[in-house]
Amino acid sequence: FIQNMFLAAATASLGILGAQYWGKGDKKTLDEIFCMALRLCGLVSAIFFVGCVFFGRYLMLIFTNEEVLINYGVSYLKIAGFSYLLTGISQCYLVIMKTSEHAKTTAVISSMTVCVNIILNAIFIFGGFGIVPMGVRGAALATLIARIIELCCSVLISYKPNYLHPSMRDLLRRNKQLSKDFWKCGL
């Protein structure tokens, strides 16, 4: 939930500023904004990944002191934490696709991801197709696989004609004025 709040603010900035620069036809600046969002969402996602994977027990202690629940939570977070690493990046790709008039593509990717997650949840949690029931760990694994598919689809599609993909050069560059605008929109 907390990670999603940060990601929502960053991707909202990407969407707002992105729509302005897309409307102007300024793909260069749009790429810079996309890269800013990727950097920020990547950082936020990395922080939550580290917290969940390496400090899951302490995070669970914030919510409960029941050992059984803590153990379930830790086993979930150790796997699902990796999906948190991917979520911020895939959300940036999906927002830039919407901004650049490819909303249908994002709807297809997002719907497919949800369907994959639901199907894999059923298989992994309860067992099926020769897979042993995994319970909570199965739910985490289903989420991770769905996020991997979502990110892979988003990145691969971004290289199609008329889609935007980030410039590696702009991932390392910082534009002070654009950063101010980005932060204003996000707050």
Question: What is each stretch, according to the model?
Answer:
Residues V50, Y58, C92-I96, C115, ...:
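Alpha-helical transmembrane segments of multipass membrane proteins
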Residues N65-E66, I70-G73, L77, Y84-S111:
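Cytoplasmic helix-loop-helix junction between adjacent transmembrane helices
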Residues Q91-C92, S110-N117, E150, G186:
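Short, Lys/Arg-enriched charge-dense amphipathic segments
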Residues F1-V50, T87-T106:
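Small-residue-rich hydrophobic transmembrane alpha-helices
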Residues A9, V50, V114-C115, I148:
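Hydrophobic/small/kink-forming positions within alpha-helical transmembrane segments
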Residues G18-S83, I131-G186:
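Short alpha-helical transmembrane segments in multi-pass integral membrane proteins
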Residues C41, I96-I123, R137-L144:
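Alpha-helical transmembrane segments of multi-pass membrane transporters/permeases
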Residues F6-L7, S13, L61, Y76, ...:
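Generic detector of short alpha-helix boundary/capping microenvironments
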